[in-house]
Amino acid sequence: MTKQEKIVSMFNDIAPTYDRANRVLSMGVDTIWRKKACNLAFSYCGDEALSIVDVACGTGDMMGYWKRIGDENSILIDEIIGVDPSDGMVGVGREKFPQMSFYIAPATVLPRENSSADIISISYGIRNVMERQEALIEFNRVLKTGGLVVILEFMKNENPSSLGKVRDWYMNNVLPRIGGLISNNYEAYRYLPDSIEGFLTVGKMEKELEEAGFEMLYSKSFSMDISTLMIARKK
């Protein structure tokens, strides 16, 4: 089994408890980050009806926020589709959002035509894509010229502030234990801090986006640098 296959299998295992663990472990703050991402992305869009693809959609949380924030701001949305390689996560998503379309596929092979989407989002998922550069090139293929890629992620912090050190302590010592208790899978929540430590810094992620044909519009970290929002436009 490849590393990517192991990650997908892990998410299949924790799918039934994933949403509850997320809310508890983030203390609900992740909802603020998701709303911020949607609102800011919409501010860069024009008046035409939007096609949105949420990659690594999991149980569909971000898809729900795109719909809700869009409705609140009278944004015209033609479609919102979710793509994820975990059938366990997608199964939960289909129960939560039966009116939305989900596809089981990796980030590197999106079931969409060239230049067909206005927004591609990936929330806390790009870190789990082993073939990351290939995925970014695939995002570029599917997006229209001027389309947006919206990334929310836990990034590696090479020079953490005092608050950042508190974040790291929480991630390494508290999160795996609580997540393990909720999901009965300690290993899955031990993976999170380990994967962050092995991931990119903000600067390196920005460089990869630019190398894949995007220009950065926005990049900022929130809540003790726990979460980073990046928005880039296809050239």
Where are these regions (language model features)?
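A short SAM/SAH-binding and catalytic strip from SAM-dependent methyltransferases
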Residues: 118-132
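C-terminal alpha-helical "lid/dimerization" subdomain adjacent to the S-adenosyl-L-methionine
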Residues: 5-6, 152-208, 212, 218
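N-terminal, positively charged/glycine-rich alpha-helical extensions of SAM-dependent methyltransferases
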Residues: 1-19, 171
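Class I SAM-dependent methyltransferase SAM/SAH-binding core
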Residues: 51-109
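Core SAM-dependent methyltransferase catalytic element
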Residues: 212-215, 220-235
